[in-house]
Amino acid sequence: MKFLLLSALLFLHSSLAWTREKHYYIGITEAVWDYASGSEEKELISVDTEQSNFYLRNGPDRIGRKYKKALYSEYTDGTFTKTIDKPAWLGFLGPVIKAEVGDKVSVHVKNFASRPYTFHAHGVTYTKANEGAIYPDNTTDFQRADDKLFPGQQYLYVLRANEPSPGEGDSNCVTRIYHSHVDAPKDIASGLIGPLILCKKGSLHKEKEENIDQEFVLMFSVVDENLSWYLEDNIKTFCSEPEKVDKDNEDFQESNRMYSINGYTFGSLPGLSMCAEDRVKWYLFGMGNEVDVHSELFHGQALTSKNYHTDIINLFPATLIDVSMVAQNPGVWMLSCQNLNHLKAGLQAFFQVRDCNKPSPDDDIQDRHVRHYYIAAEETIWDYAPSGTDTFTGENFTSLGSDSRVFFEQGATRIGGSYKKLVYREYTDDSFTNRKERGPDEEHLGILGPVIWAEVGDIIRVTFHNKGQFPLSIQPMGVRFTKENEGTYYGPDGRSSKQASHVAPKETFTYEWTVPKEMGPTYADPVCLSKMYYSGVDLTKDIFTGLIGPMKICKKGSLLADGRQKDVDKEFYLFATVFDENESLLLDDNIRMFTTAPENVDKEDEDFQESNKMHSMNGFMYGNLPGLNMCLGESIVWYLFSAGNEADVHGIYFSGNTYLSKGERRDTANLFPHKSLTLLMTPDTEGSFDVECLTTDHYTGGMKQKYTVNQCKGQFEDVTLYQGERTYYIAAVEVEWDYSPSRDWEMELHHLQEQNVSNAFLDKEEFFIGSKYKKVVYREFTDSTFREQVKRRAEEEHLGMLGPLIHADVGAKVKVVFKNMATRPYSIHAHGVKTKSSTVAPTLPGEVRTYIWQIPERSGAGTEDSPCIPWAYYSTVDRVKDLYSGLIGPLIVCRKSYVKVFNPKKKMEFSLLFLVFDENESWYLDDNINTYPDHPEKDNKDNEEFIESNKMHAINGKMFGNLQGLTMHVGDEVNWYVMAMGNEIDLHTVHFHGHSFQYKHRGIHSSDVFDFFPGTYQTLEMFPQTPGTWLLHCHVTDHIHAGMVTTYTVLPNQETKSG
């Protein structure tokens, strides 16, 4: 390929202009790694010793805490004879590689291991000969030498740090990574990963970022040793009776998942030490699989990320984040993952803040205002749905065939919809005799405790009385507290105050927290920050028992005397979670009280456990949440927060209206464990609308409510003058869809990886459906006769299963003439738009219906958005089944002022949907079973292998390199409109090889990985500069292996071509 050779020559020529060349000598070695090294000298963090033993103790069929791994080690020079020591806290990560923009980085890699590996870097520029990743990319000869480094071989990888990374709005130095990429998930699980720090030019002084005293790199990962290349070696070496090991046994597999930070678990990570008042930079990243939903909490500290104050950092596989803090409060503090499953499994560490007598700034808390709250924890019987009916369907909760029956059926071994719980409630004084009654504005709080609010400069005093039967506490977020006021206990003694963290039954304790400036909103934040408080004795059990409440921390002078925000009409607090009543402190009480045959209850039974997982908002399900009422044109603030585990990946969708969050216009907010958000909304359409979780299991499980917008303050009119109307003729058409029409790319990939693996999703075999399915898709037609389908142009080929790309400008209307050419009712509805009615009428088979979408200002980009932003449109007759049957497409809304015509660069746009299509939920499942398997009569729709085989990990409905048409030229300006929908497993960290992209988020930021979840729509802007065929994939382990990968091609520009 001539243009690739030319590209390489251009890079060599341009290297003369680079300011500095740096050399790193890295060897790939094999060693035994101890996940709890040094734990003999110090007590591990574990609520339950049995829990830590499960992961760390070896035995006849258990490996324990030591594993053979492959590691990146740094050497002094090219002789590879002397290693360079690294900080203890780096754990098994490779050495820190640092570069400033303009640097040429030469990484000399030698493989001392027993199998082939590579070195692949994120965030830097490289040619195909320096990519270090093996996949079918049309390269040959010398460009393939980097793809696989065999034992004993050495290779020089040449990387260049250049714009746009870091972006203009990024920190001076940002987090990137490098890892081996023969089979990336297996290589990484084996240990080959390390940090790469990219810095703006001139920001490093003696290899340290200026104005930073301490810096640390942390990887949060559930390291899956079952995927390691060395699993067999580890079984033979560390199991005392290896012949007894069943590698498919679920408990054995779980025992090999190490919930770790830099390869250390249960608090054994060494060396995180700093002085009070040190300016500390944390370079953080996640890695792993669908279970890797991380919510990192730095206890006792205030963090700044992208100019926002926060105390929780959410990380997913290949999420790359940097945060800064000024260390405060001398003592030993915990750094923990607040995913409740991870917390139990050991994903914690300690960091020490020492008093080094460094001068501290003057206390900025003057004219201290003390806000005093009297809060008790008390028992109550909580009904998740007091109306007894699903307000969305009008059905009784226990109707046969209803989604709700599994949760609300009460009987011999079922609890039903009411549970004994512990809740926080507010009282008038410390006698705790007169409970404060909630007013109409607080009706919606439901199970939540009272709102604790404060302004910057305030002192919060909470007198807490425990009326329950277990030790409890109150642990706040978003405020400052001393060790004596910390509501979370973590031993050994001396690290926590037992008095504050274990308030005994019938006892009272008064907490005091402060709100210094660094804990309050920044200039970029909203006026008030959404926060939460909860009991922290046993975080999992306490929260699931019901002990959680909302907080808001506001700018000074922004609140009225009663705590309401000035210039805001209404404030609502929403807590989305799957309350796992199996983890409740009161489970046994509930079994005794509500089941009719408690002695027959098997608490380990999966069906029993599922019946106790209550998908709720503020403790209500299926539209039973009261009090979400507002007026047209009012200024509304929503405070959202969540808690839970990896199942708690929420896309909270507000139908009928949009909101602003940090300058971005959206209608769906993504929540994760312990994440909180503040959303600003001005409702402009009258009616009853949905606020619901788009995660499909949560939606069907009842995490959906109604909010009502009324005309109540005179006439509120939409004054938008809609100019121009564009008409689209779109039909729902049933087709045979092939997720993988060619297996060539997939087969060549496995050949290059020297693996012979079957494919559970595409191999038809005797009972499985294979790659072809009957589906229904949106297709565009030329006119209202619906006789001639519009043929897709070359630049639209990439849309695949998606419906047509619909464009609209702010101030215009879109008229969709929709014909249902399928065999069952469907509709077409778009996110973000304004419609005359809050309901979307179904269109019956054979019918034609016209839908009008208005595009007011609030449908377009926010002040901090890209000029054009994507929304999704889909059918809403049955939101879940319609989606999985294939009905979804992109709507792109651009600002009025956005001019595309005069840009000298060629503008390209590609729309991508990352979705695990669950064909088990398709309307056409029975048709597909009858059509495609060789023996349909033998298929069992409840068989786990059959169910798994129908989950198609696709990009625009294509798998394993089958998505075609992602072609561009060097010098093009490319907009990627990326969307995600789906279920709990649909967390997608989208990674582009070869190029970084930019995105807007209160400034221009750069990365090569972006996180997507159900209801995430984002514009990514790319300026291709390096020719080649490049990998584009989801970085989640199972999704890579399941086929959520394709390639995009960058051709040389016209000048290069002609020259």
From Swiss-Prot:
Q: Where is the signal peptide?
A: 1-19
EC primary class: oxidoreductase
Cofactor(s), by name = Cu(2+)
Q: Gene3D superfamilies attached here?
A: Cupredoxins - blue copper proteins
Q: What is the lineage of its organism?
A: Eukaryota, Metazoa, Chordata, Craniata, Vertebrata
Give the species this sequence originates from: Rattus norvegicus (Rat)
The UniProt record gives the binding positions of Cu(2+) 5 as 650, 693, 698, 703
The protein, known as: Ceruloplasmin
> Binding of Cu(2+) 2: at which residues?
122, 179, 1035
